[in-house]
A protein has these predicted regions:
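Elongated alpha-helical scaffolds
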Residues: 71-79
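Short glycine-rich phosphate-binding loop at a beta-alpha junction
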Residues: 62-71
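Long, low-complexity, Lys/Arg-enriched
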Residues: 1-62, 78-81, 85-126
Length: 126
């Protein structure tokens, strides 16, 4: 499985939990440095950000993907739209949460969000 990380660096412990939850080995982590310029249109920045992951059109469509979205909500929304356009579906998304009472602040894997399954379920409620 290929992890595309648009957020903070994932640790070996995070990846071990991902492998346990998904039942698949992480073959590669693509680290994408994410910074948005408030003075420029966000859609073009999201496009460039996803481009910078360096995947080919075939890879976007055929690799088993897990995405760690940017923390900034507008960036995350646009990155998701861009990814859906390239993959043809909503990718699985990693959700991290703060570890209670950790100093310094630490984060742990909370769950893997299956956005495509959520979308398909929601369509039944139309």
């Amino acid at each position: 499985m290929l992890v595309v990380n648009f957020a903070h660096v994932l640790t070996h412990a995070h990846l071990a939990v991902v492998e346990r939850l998904t039942g698949s080995a992480v073959s590669k982590v693509v680290e994408v440095k994410t910074q948005f310029d408030e003075s420029r249109p966000f859609a073009e920045q999201a496009r460039a950000l996803v481009d910078s992951a360096g995947l080919t059109p075939d890879e976007w469509q055929t690799e088993r993907l897990l995405v760690n979205l940017p923390s900034y909500n507008y960036a995350a929304a646009l990155v998701l739209a861009e990814l859906h356009g390239r993959t043809g579906y909503f990718p699985a998304v990693l959700r991290l949460r703060p570890v209670a009472d950790s100093t310094p602040q630490q984060f742990e894997v909370a769950e893997i969000l299956n956005l495509q399954a959520t979308r398909e379920e929601a369509r039944r409620r139309r």
